[in-house]
């Protein structure tokens, strides 16, 4: 498990919820049928299908989801 990547994904999901009228975990979970609380607590590492469902819900592309993550960091 890549904990750094997981934390970046968790922060991105939280950011999207807050950008869209401060939706609760429950609202997103109900709309997507996903375990958002478990994802945001780091208990579940999301797969690409899970992230794709979140992207469809927020009407964004996978590129738009991952663009602000800047991962993996460039070697110096």
What are these model-derived regions, one by one?
Residues 1-20:
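A short, Lys/Arg-rich alpha-helix, primarily the initiator
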Residues 3-4, 56, 66-76:
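Short, charged recognition helix plus adjacent turn
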Residues 13, 24-25, 48-51:
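Helix-turn-helix DNA-binding elements, focusing on the entry/boundary residues of the two helices
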Residues 21-38:
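Short alpha-helical DNA-recognition segment
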Residues 41:
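Short, conserved catalytic or interaction motifs in soluble domains
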Residues 49-64:
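DNA major-groove recognition helix of helix-turn-helix/homeodomain DNA-binding modules
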């Amino acid at each position: 498990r890549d904990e750094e990547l997981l934390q970046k994904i968790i922060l991105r999901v939280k950011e999207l919820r807050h950008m869209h009228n401060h939706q609760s975990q429950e609202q997103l979970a109900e709309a997507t049928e996903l375990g958002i609380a478990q994802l945001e607590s780091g208990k579940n590492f999301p797969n690409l299908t899970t992230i794709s469902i979140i992207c469809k819900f927020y009407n964004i592309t996978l590129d738009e989801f991952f663009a602000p993550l800047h991962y993996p960091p460039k070697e110096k």
